[in-house]
Amino acid sequence: MAGRSDPIPDEAAEWLAEEGVAGAAPRKGFPAARAEHRVSQQPAFVLHSYPYRETSLIIDVFTRDHGRIALVAKGAKRPHSALRAVLQTFQPLSLSWSGRGEVKTLTRAEWVGGMLPLGGEGLLSGFYLNELLVKFVAREDGHPVLFSHYVETLNKLAHGEPVAFTLRAFERVLLRETGFAAQLDRCVDGEPVQPDGDYVYHPERGIRRALPSDPSSWPVLRGQTLLDMERDDYSRPATATQSRSLMRFLLHYHLHGTPLSTRQILIDLQKL
C-alpha cells in the first residue's frame, strides 16, 4: 500500500507533449480546463510505465470504470518506494488519483491479489493484450465489460488454457466493445448466418454473403465458423484457422497496417 497527495506537476504535461500524447500540453500559464477530479479505490491494471525524471514514473493503467488513465507515480523509482513493488503488470490493483487534464496524480495504490502470475507464452500473450488495449481503448472511456473480460483472459492464461483460443475470444470482445466489430451470427441486412454459407466481414459494415467481386484480401468464412466464434467455441479445426485469419484481417485494417510487435513475436513462435 502506498499513498501520495501531491498535485500534478507541470513537467508531467510537458513530458506527455514531448512524447506525442494527444491533448497534452504544459499547464503553466493556462487556466484549468476542468475541475479537480478525484477517484478512489478503482480496480485497475498497469498496462505500461514510462520513466519520468530521476525518481518517478508515468503509468498507463486500464481501469474498470474510467478506461485508460495516465498517472504520475511520484517517487516510484526510488529503491525503497512502496509503489515500486505494487505497480506491476498483470496484477489486480486498487488505485486512487486526483487532478485535472490528461495526466492525473496517483494518490494511493494497493495490491489486491488473488491472481496467479503469468509465465512463458502466457506472459508474452499478456503483453499482447496490453498492447491491444493501448491501441484500441481511448483515454477516460470506460469499458466495464472489456475490463471483466481482460481479468478473465489473464486468469485463463495463468491456468494454462489454450493460448490461441483464449486470445481469439479476447480480440472479439475488444473489437466489439470499442465499436470496431459487430455480432457474428447475423448479417448486416438482418439475415441470420447459415452454417453452410460462405461469408465475408466488410470491415466497415459487418457480415454479409461472399461475392465473386470481393477483394482477395478479405478472408472467406464459413457460416459455422462465425457461429462458433459468437459462442467462443474454437474447437473445430476450420474455426480455429478461419478465426485467426479474420482477426488478423480486422486488426490490420483498424490499425491502418501498423504492426503489433507482440503479435509478430507470437506469430514467429507459431502460437497465434
Curated annotation (Swiss-Prot):
User: Which domain of life does the protein's organism represent?
Assistant: Bacteria
Which gene carries the instructions for this protein?
A: recO
Gene Ontology cellular component annotations, sorted alphabetically: bacterial nucleoid
This one is known as DNA repair protein RecO
Q: Which residues cross the membrane?
A: none
What biological processes does GO assign it?
DNA recombination; double-strand break repair
Origin species: Ralstonia nicotianae (strain ATCC BAA-1114 / GMI1000) (Ralstonia solanacearum)
Q: Could you say which residues form the signal peptide?
A: none
**Pfam families from the UniProt entry:** RecO_C (PF02565), RecO_N (PF11967)
Q: Which family does it belong to?
A: Belongs to the RecO family.
Q: Which UniProt keywords apply?
A: DNA damage, DNA recombination, DNA repair
Q: What does this protein do?
A: Involved in DNA repair and RecF pathway recombination.
